[in-house]
Amino acid sequence: MQKLFESLGYEGDRRFNTLNGHQRLLYLEGVNGRQIDVFIDRMKMCHVIELANRLGHEGPTLTPADLLLSKLQVYEVNMKDLVDTAALLLDHPIADHDDDAINGAYLARLTSDDWGLHRTLQLNSGRVRDAARVLEVDSRLIDQRLDELWSKIDAQPKSLRWKVRARVGDRVSWYQLPEEVRQPYQKD
């Protein structure tokens, strides 16, 4: 993998990859400041998202639902993540499958067992709605798709673990703050 990224003009972040290579690798492109994160079996940022069983689909990247999770599960979400999320919502309908759609059934299952993930997605959905208005994109379509997604999430029965954690609520932190490697699109 390292040779592939190097042939494409990316350089591995040696320190980060040495410390985190068992779960995540980071490659940076020096000219345009692009960053590629490679997650190994799971995405561990503010929440842990298991990906091992989600990688068998056709396509060069994660499914739209997993890409959406990669953005919305970040508690301290930045404008780049909000823009990316808006683009995903504009480009992909909500459905119960992964074929060029955001799999709402999958997201509902994940959030029905993890109150913290549910809460972070809930907060960030509001932030995406606000950002869509500022960005002057089709905020009605974004609202419609988020409403459809939350209809599925809210309809999914919640686990006992979810219900117990919900009683604690926001009084206790429900997320981890990952190490910030660098700001998106900024060279070192």
Which residues make up each language-model segment?
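Conserved catalytic core of two-metal-ion nucleotidyltransferases
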Residues: Q2-C46
